């Protein structure tokens, strides 16, 4: 597998957003300013609550097929390799890791089989698009921790995806959960979210290496990043953490992550989090405390690492 010098793009894009000239300019700037070679198009379908069994991927909350296909073609015209990553959010704000149902079916209660039927239909829809547009990889969702114990349903879902998409397939498990997935044999690439504290990377890499070694499959961090906020380098997954804007702390996180992972040949890339399809003004970077690296010191650190 080629080393993935990747960035997640377009997260939470709504219908019509990819039609805006600013969205294509953002994608061009991603390449120019970071040296990124792989762009991950992350899509967010919606379900009403963690116990809802119907997934909506056709509303105003998500780009439509035509604009997605057009943007993938545009990315490829720029020379990007493309990865499609459809996942799901919960409309009431609950994190998708808490999507959950009874292990044994109970009459009149929502059931795993109904949720997986809807989720698999959703995945099949985008697997067709990934195949038609020549995407180099397909990520069958991310960080759905409670679902991961349902190995049989996940195997069936992945098998249905493969009926439509014939390239490498992965699933993006959450930080610290690499050992929770018993069905890594059913994917081509193992991936997880690399939101690990600055200073703890060696410990986490030692742990992950022992878990994935028996599977003998490529591995990359399908997500990794850190807000530019005081305290975020110690809990980079917490997007709600309160703290002052701190561009240096974000830069230090990236330097540490790249330094430690570059010493492990089995780490074969990143899908950094994240590059917005509608960028803030570059002059506003000094006041921006989220995951964006646009116009911040971390942006230069990423480019130096990606182009070497």
Q: Where do the model's predicted regions map?
A:
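Aromatic-lined carbohydrate-recognition surfaces of secreted/lumenal glycan-active proteins
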Residues: 81-88, 92-93, 137-149, 155-179, ...
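Substrate-binding cleft and catalytic face of glycoside hydrolase catalytic domains
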Residues: 36-52, 66-147, 276-278
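Aromatic-rich peripheral "rim/lid" segments of glycoside hydrolase catalytic domains that contact
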Residues: 18, 260, 264-308
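Short, acidic/polar
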Residues: 15-32, 116-129, 174-183, 251-260
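Aromatic- and acid-rich polysaccharide-binding/catalytic face
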Residues: 123-142, 173-203, 218, 222-230, ...
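Aromatic- and glycine-enriched glycan-recognition loops and surfaces
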Residues: 16-31, 56-77, 121
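Active-site clefts of carbohydrate-active enzymes
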Residues: 194-195, 214-252, 272-289
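The substrate-binding groove and active-site-proximal loops of carbohydrate-active enzymes
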Residues: 10-17, 52-65, 105-120, 141-148, ...
């Amino acid at each position: 597998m080629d080393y993935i010098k990747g960035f997640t793009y377009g997260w939470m894009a709504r219908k019509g957003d990819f039609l805006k000239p600013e969205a294509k300019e953002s994608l061009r700037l991603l390449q120019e300013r970071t040296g990124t070679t792989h762009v991950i198009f992350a899509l967010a379908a919606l379900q009403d609550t963690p116990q809802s069994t119907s997934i909506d991927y056709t509303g105003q909350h998500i780009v439509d097929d035509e604009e997605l296909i057009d943007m993938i073609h545009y990315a490829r015209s720029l020379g990007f390799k493309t990865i499609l990553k459809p996942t799901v959010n919960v409309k009431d704000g609950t994190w998708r890791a808490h999507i959950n149902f009874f292990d044994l079916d109970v009459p009149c209660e929502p059931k795993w089989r109904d949720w997986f039927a809807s989720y698999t239909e959703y995945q099949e829809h985008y697997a067709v698009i990934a195949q038609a547009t020549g995407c180099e990889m397909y990520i069958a969702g991310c960080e759905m921790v409670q679902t991961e114990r349902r190995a049989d349903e996940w195997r069936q879902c992945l098998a249905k995806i493969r009926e439509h998409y014939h390239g490498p397939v992965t699933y993006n498990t959450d930080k610290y959960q690499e050992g929770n997935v018993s069905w890594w044999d059913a994917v081509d690439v193992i991936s997880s979210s690399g939101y690990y504290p600055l200073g703890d990377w060696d410990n986490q890499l030692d742990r992950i290496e022992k878990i994935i070694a028996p599977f003998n499959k490529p591995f990359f961090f399908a997500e990794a990043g850190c807000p530019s906020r005081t305290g975020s380098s110690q809990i980079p997954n917490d997007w709600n953490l309160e703290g002052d804007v701190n561009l240096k702390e974000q830069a230090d996180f990236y330097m540490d992550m790249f330094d430690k992972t570059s010493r492990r040949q089995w780490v074969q890339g990143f899908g950094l989090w994240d590059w917005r399809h509608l960028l803030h003004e570059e002059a506003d970077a000094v006041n921006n405390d989220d995951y964006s690296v646009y116009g911040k010191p971390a942006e230069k650190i990423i480019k130096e690492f990606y182009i070497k």
